[in-house]
Amino acid sequence: MVGVQLMDNETIDKLLKRFKKKYERAGVLKEFRKRAYYTKPSVDDRLKRARSKRRAQRANEESNA
């Protein structure tokens, strides 16, 4: 669970900014979206391989350019 404490002389805006940063770094929203529906392990593996392949192609294109 992500939480923040209000520090001395801290505005609500700064508190919310710190909370948002911690929330994003913790990956809460990403995990929530991932668990919103079930995907079979075989589908997960296929998507993971496709992402890896695209990443490798981009890296190869950048190194050749």
Swiss-Prot record:
Residues 48-57 have a biased composition (Basic residues). InterPro entries: Ribosomal_bS21, Ribosomal_bS21_sf. Pfam families: Ribosomal_S21. Gene3D superfamilies: Ribosomal protein S8. The keyword Ribonucleoprotein applies. One of its GO terms (cellular component) is ribosome. It comes from the Bacteria. GO terms for molecular function: structural constituent of ribosome. The keyword Ribosomal protein applies. One of its GO terms (biological process) is translation. Keywords: Ribonucleoprotein, Ribosomal protein. Residues 43-65 are annotated as: Disordered. Belongs to the bacterial ribosomal protein bS21 family. HAMAP family: Ribosomal_bS21 (MF_00358). This is Small ribosomal subunit protein bS21. The lineage of its organism: Bacteria, Pseudomonadati, Chlorobiota, Chlorobiia, Chlorobiales. The gene is rpsU.
